[in-house]
Each structure stands twice: as C-alpha cells, then as structure tokens.
Amino acid sequence: MKQIYDVIVVGGGPAGIMAAMASGKLGADTLLIEKNGFLGGAATASVLGPISPFHYKDEQVINGIPQDFMDRMVKEAGSTGHMKTLDPYGSGDSLGFYDREKYKYVAVEMLKEFGVDILYHSMIDSVDC
C-alpha cells in the first residue's frame, strides 16, 4: 500500500464507495478507509431496506457510477434492479432490493477496477495538511 494519495475517502458506506469510485475513475490515487472489516456501512451492516429511488416520477435522475453499480449488482444476481413501486410520498416510484453479501462483493470488485486501495479496521482521529 502506498503512503501518499491524491484522495483519501473516510467511510466505506454507500456515499464513500461512490466517491472513491469516482475519484479512482478520474485517475486519482485513491485510498478508502473503513472502520469495519467490510464495505457498505448501514446498507450491509444493518437491516436496511432497498436501495433508494433513482427515479423522480417517470424520469431516472440518478445515473453514472451509482447506475453502473446497480447494473453490476443485477449482473451478479445481487439485486432486483429498479422495481416500479407505489409512490405515496412523491419521493420516487422505484426501489432496488439487494443481497448484502453481493453488495460487499460488487463494491470491492468495482473499487479494484478503478484502482482504489482499501484500508479496513481503521479510523481517523486527526488530519494534518
């Protein structure tokens, strides 16, 4: 593992995973630091519901790396993909149910493809610039 990185992402939950993938995809030397021994945060460590809507009304408003992740999950038989649902609150009418273990696997595989290093069982208590 290198000692100097262009970008360090702290926290391997859904947002941290996507941020690290984006950084790696753009060619930055990237390190993702996660306190647990696996990625996914609340999406894999708890009984969290489905992946939130990628749609607003009939339009898909979330694309890019999150959609690439969803596509890979479907390919690995780890997600239903976007399923049309009721929309009682007006927040989106599609959800993606997923397998927590496949989520962890797909996250690691995609991060590796983007050249991101992962440091597990680690926390940050200060940063000097």
Name each region found by the language model.
Residues 8-10, 19-24, 31, 128:
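Membrane-embedded transmembrane-helix bundle of lipid-linked glycan/lipid transferases
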Residues 1-15:
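Beta1/beta-strand and adjacent pyrophosphate-binding region of the FAD-binding site
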Residues 11-14, 120, 129:
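Glycine-rich phosphate-binding loop of nucleotide-binding enzymes
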Residues 22, 28-29, 35-126:
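Conserved N-terminal/central alpha/beta ligand/cofactor-binding core
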Residues 14-18, 104:
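Short alpha-helical segments and helix-capping/turn motifs at coil-helix boundaries
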